[in-house]
Every structure is written in structure tokens, then in C-alpha cells.
């Protein structure tokens, strides 16, 4: 019997492949556990159409992420904080604060705190380069200027 795999199956194939299996294995295990469907022309064409839509959606999302990275690289985020006598901040600048200030100063950029990579919290004034990982292999940086209030 010919089946279309819906997910990767060890020693058989990867999702989307059409495989020839024995009737019992196909009906009693693969189809029963929704790991595969009977490979008819209709099922194969439907799966290919869904895969194509998914690939187009992923390409669009990646393009949007690349556009966001290009925009991020052109900005410098300014954060005003109270500073002690030796130039250190009262408190530290964290990922949450960076995302809040980014939304305030640049409303079109919507980053989540999990997208920002901080090696350590920022505790003094100066200019810092912050790394942003948006998924799909898209990585960028932007600058933060921490100034005394």
C-alpha cells in the first residue's frame, strides 16, 4: 500500500514522502496513529498545496524580520536614568525596559524581550550595542545610549 507520511517516521522516511509499506503496518500503525494517510492523488495534491502555502508564509515572515533588522540598525535608542556619583546607574537596564522604551520611541518596532540578547544588565552610562535574534536565522544589532537624567 502507498502512504503519504505526515511526520518523520524512523527507518521509513520524512514527512511529505510517499512510501510503500505492508497493509497491516500502514493501516494498523501509521494511519491509526495519524502518522500517515493513504496516498491518493487528491491527498498528495492537497499536501503539496499546504506545503507551498507554508513555505510562502515562512518566506514572508523572514522578509519582514529582515526589514525590521534593517530598521533597527539605523536607530539609536536613548534611555535617561538616574546616575550616582561614580557614573553607575541606580538599578540596571534590563530587556523589559529596553522593549518598553523601544515601543515608546519607535512604535512600528514591536520586539519581545525574548528577542533581545543581553550578556549582562546595563549598569552604567554609555553607548551599548544590543544583539537581537528574531528567529529563522535573522540576527541584528542596534545601539542604546544611556545618559544621565
From Swiss-Prot:
Keyword RNA-binding among UniProt keywords: yes
GO cellular component, one term: ribosome
Gene3D superfamilies given in the database record: Ribosomal protein L9, C-terminal domain, Ribosomal protein L9, N-terminal domain
Alphabetically ordered keywords of this record: Ribonucleoprotein, Ribosomal protein, RNA-binding, rRNA-binding
Spans traversing the lipid bilayer: none
PANTHER family for the chain: 50S RIBOSOMAL PROTEIN L9
Protein name: Large ribosomal subunit protein bL9
Organism: Helicobacter pylori (strain P12)
